[in-house]
Amino acid sequence: TFPPTSSDGDVAFERALTGSVPASENVAVKIQYNNGGVPSADAYLDYIILEAKRNLQGYGKQFRFQYNDADLNTGVIQYQLSSAARITQVWDITDIYNVQKVENNGADAFSFKAYMGEDRNYIAVDASDFYSPLKDSRTRVANQNLKGSILKNAQGSFQDLDYLIVTPAFLNSQAERLANFHRTNSNLNVKVVNLENIYEEFSSGKQDIGAIRNFVKYIYNNGSIPSKKLKYLNLFGDASFDFKNRISNNTNIVPVFQALNSFSLGGSIMSDDYFTMLDDNEGTMLQTGSQDMELAVGRMLVSDLKQAEEMVTKVIEYHAIESYGKWRNNFVLISDDVDVAWENSIQTGIDALGDQISAQKPFVNVEKIHTDSYVQEASAGGFRYPKARKDFVDAINQGALVFNYFGHGGEDGLAKERIFEKADAQNLNNRYKYPLFVTVTCEFTRFDNPYRPTAGEYTYWNPKGGAISMVTTTRQISVTTGQDINDAFSNELYGYGTTNNVPISEALRVAKNNYNGSALMVSYVGDPAIRLAIPKPTIVLTKINDQPVAASTFVFNALSPVKLSGEVRNVEGNTILSNYNGSLSVNIFDKNVQRTTFGNDGVTDSSGNLIVMDFILLGETIFRGNASVANGQFEFNFVVPRDIAIPVGNGRISFYAKRNQGLEDQTGYNTDIKIGGINPNATADNIGPRVRLYMNDETFISGGITNESPIFLAFLEDENGINTASGIGHDIVAILDGDENNPYILNDYYETELDNHTKGKVRFPFRNLAVGLHTITFKAWDVYNNPVTAEIQFIVVGDETVTLKNVLNYPNPFVSYTQFWFTHNRPYEPLEVQVQIITITGKIVKTINQVVTTEGFLSREITWDGKDDFGDKIGKGVYVYKLTVKSTLTNKKTEKYEKLVIL
């Protein structure tokens, strides 16, 4: 019986065992499995190799042989072969580039000698068993010259290359679309090179990751000067562990480096760093020693043209005008709870990172979601943090520049309590607010397994939401490595002590190069040339109630009217940008709040004390406003809500500005303002706000139809403004279908109108509502805590079908002009609409075809002048018309008939 194997968590084991077997042609191997007393435990046998000594005897085939103990001995060994008449030669293939041979002149028995001290490998060549080279079906190869053309421009002159995109030919169109964007938007010299061409020139046409690396090295080594060498490498395609395409639905689009050790999650590294280690004697990919990355690398996980188009579109949208907004001031950190004592370093480590970012880059609004500070609830599947999960997903949908998670995780999601899963990733709806997703966890984005798509991949793949890019883990990572890399990466990403803004992938490259250890399990997923969309400095508060800030002693008392003035200045903060015109968004926060985690799992330290953590949160948002910026200057007014915390202390103002002409954005902050106390001279106000409710747009009428994910709109007005300070019982809330135990808190979704703090709007997206009638009860408060309540009803119809209601034409009867109106359930979708005018005898006299897209559910875009298809005026009288609407996404259609009268 062979001895049992054991392990501390490896997924497979290889063991060389020595035993005695009978000297016969048939050998039986018996395996006895010890389950350790666990009936449910299983072992999975891959294969057994039986290796034994045998006589060197010819048998009509060529064969390989070696003496395994040769390296353990010194001196000379003699090999004797029998039945060797047909063995013409013995080859020494120990060095495949220097093969030696021993001749046999037809003797039935012959021998040769060799020195011991090392293992040597031989092949006995039988004259009747010569192998024939395989014939490649692709015998014609087109002329090409990558080496001669890659560093030349269209005119044939030398030009350094900034950005290389490597992709197979079938993805070329979208790779070129991305390249064209960066040529125009990023001023980079970009080239797209197909894998097939790289293989032809660097590996004789065969798939070889070494060929890709050697091609990249050739470009890098031939840059004109160090500062102009190749900077970015985009591996434009998904990857797989199966290089040989043996499995169905494989994703081996652009191959990735795979470590030889495939038996453990810690050792079975896959990494794209291999392609960037370009100095001499680098590229061994050992997890020890120093091997620097010479350029930044990223992989866009795309497997077909549709997916490629979606991911390139996200890159373009990340830079579009619609993506500019105050969400770019936000950073969200999320920590796992403490299940065992050593895990306390997870939450304390990332909390310290958040505080460091606040100190180094004070314009950043750091939101902290420490799961252990939420109430833990028991469920059938284990303990959960439903409120933390909701806050996590809501924060993504509302927008933040970076999400940074530290804790346990895996291919299916984050944390044992499942605070973020695959379904969450697929249902995110944060278009134009795509964040960088940083996950310090295990295997969250293990993208080389086609059998099991991960939550990380779904986060990236979401075409209308999710992440723009990810710094993420593909295998197991230790807490120490994760903490060190996360801190170093954040330092480079935000440029501590500087105003630098390097590409995200470059920040990771520098962090990994500076790390004294291996971080091969950390990968960058996404376009390596994009930079984090950090607004530029500097927006400055200059006056409070017309008094210079430096001289002001004003305290923001509850119910005090406040006027704030400021300027948009240059990066250094010393010169106003007098040609700056645009808009400003502002958030004013109450004093910071200190919180303590709960220690939900009851874990204690070595002294028996419950492990909890004190941490600092931003105060409640007491005002969200918008103002115009004219010639670099702005001002706005608001009334401080009654619900501020009364003790006086430092508050915070967060500014964000967007320029109208010459698209750019700026940021700023102030933490010197004082908030607290009550205004004893506040004017009386006992009148509540006024409100109007709609679904999707202002044409909606209560009781109308919607799709399954409508937008709820509430337009509010009050002479002193709306309260968003989250005082107890004074939140802006929506109650769906009377479920008061699960209200929707809408404070964060309220924004004032431009230059008017007395009016504003709530815009909240509902998701996946059930088909049927629904009622929303809405309640809001003004800053004096006077309430308003209103209600709206709507009918959800399934999104798969096209639903028509309220089909009419206006005016009707008409003389020379009418519009065709209808409500539908397909907002934001191009609809093919046809209107046919028919006489009472059935003759079609006019056909109108038009594609319409509406933000809401009402369409009134189609007009008719009363003329037929030939341009002639048709006669007076009654006509029938058929209105047909077809979805361009599902090809489903519906139609309705109505009457019209021409006078």
Task: Describe the residue ranges of each PLM region.
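Cysteine-dependent hydrolase recognition
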Residues: T1-N626, A630-V639, P647-G649, F655-G677, ...
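Contiguous beta-strand segments within globular domains
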Residues: L72-Q78, L333, A550-S585, T699-D731, ...
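Short, glycine-anchored, charge-dense loop/turn motifs used at functional sites
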Residues: V90, V833-V845, Y879
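Proline-centered linker/hinge motifs at extracellular inter-domain junctions
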Residues: P537-I539, N681-L693, H774, V802
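Long, low-complexity serine/threonine/glycine- and acidic-rich segments characteristic of extracellular
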Residues: S585-G677, Y694-T699, L713-G798, V852-F857
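Short, surface-exposed loop/turn motifs with a glycine/proline- and acidic-biased composition
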Residues: L769-V771, T775, Q850-T890
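A structural signal for beta-strand boundary/capping segments at domain termini and interdomain linkers
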Residues: N785-T789, I844, G871-K873, K892-E895
